């Protein structure tokens, strides 16, 4: 099986206010407070889709900030019909949808495979977060697919690309 990865970019000059916010945000040790403050910030500070490069037929990842404590934030610009692999995350993951529509299929680990448990649709202004086991990368196993061209902000407690990949 060939696994195609998204294209990753570092930062964006028009998003300095986001980096300043994130630098302060990541000094907070409580993931739930991080989620609350991020929702509040993003409702007050519009982030346009056009600020981030597309990468058809998948999605692009623009790293907005990486902190010394390993927290990172990135923007994902999804092409319509883009689908991620089934993957896990570090201890904490937070997604906030700014534009478009995303379908998130949730899975549970079963050996080296994943078993689907739920599917949810997210629209602009909606978010979800996951809190799992520290020092593992198989938390919050899911697959994301874009029903429309979309833009989402993601915050992780470590490098999301370390997430374990699963098959069904």
Predicted regions and their residues:
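Short glycine/proline-enriched turns and hinge-like loops at secondary-structure junctions
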Residues: 87-90, 146
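N-terminal leader/capping segments at the start of a protein or of a new domain
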Residues: 1-47
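Glycine- and acidic-residue-biased ligand/ion/polar-headgroup-sensing regions
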Residues: 90-109
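A short hydrophobic beta-strand segment most commonly corresponding to one strand
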Residues: 94-96, 142-163
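A short glycine-rich, His/Asp/Glu-containing loop-to-beta-strand
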Residues: 50-80
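Conserved short histidine dyad/triad with adjacent acidic residue
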Residues: 74-88, 122, 133-135
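Short acidic-glycine-tyrosine-enriched beta hairpin
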Residues: 106-142
């Amino acid at each position: 099986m060939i696994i195609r990865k998204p294209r990753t970019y570092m930062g964006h000059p028009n998003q300095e206010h986001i980096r300043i916010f994130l630098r302060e945000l990541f000094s907070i040790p409580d993931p739930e407070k991080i989620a609350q403050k991020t929702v509040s910030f993003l409702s007050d500070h519009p982030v346009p889709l056009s600020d981030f490069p597309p990468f058809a037929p998948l999605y692009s990842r623009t790293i907005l900030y990486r902190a010394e404590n390993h927290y990172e934030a990135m923007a994902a610009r999804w092409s319509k019909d883009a689908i991620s692999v089934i993957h896990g995350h570090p201890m904490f993951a937070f997604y906030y949808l700014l534009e478009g529509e995303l379908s998130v299929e949730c899975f549970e680990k079963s050996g080296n495979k994943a078993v689907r448990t739920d599917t949810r649709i997210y629209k602009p202004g909606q978010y979800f977060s996951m809190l799992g086991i520290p020092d593992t990368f198989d938390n919050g196993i899911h697959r994301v697919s874009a029903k429309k061209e979309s833009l989402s902000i993601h915050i992780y407690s470590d490098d999301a690309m370390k997430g374990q990949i699963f098959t069904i």
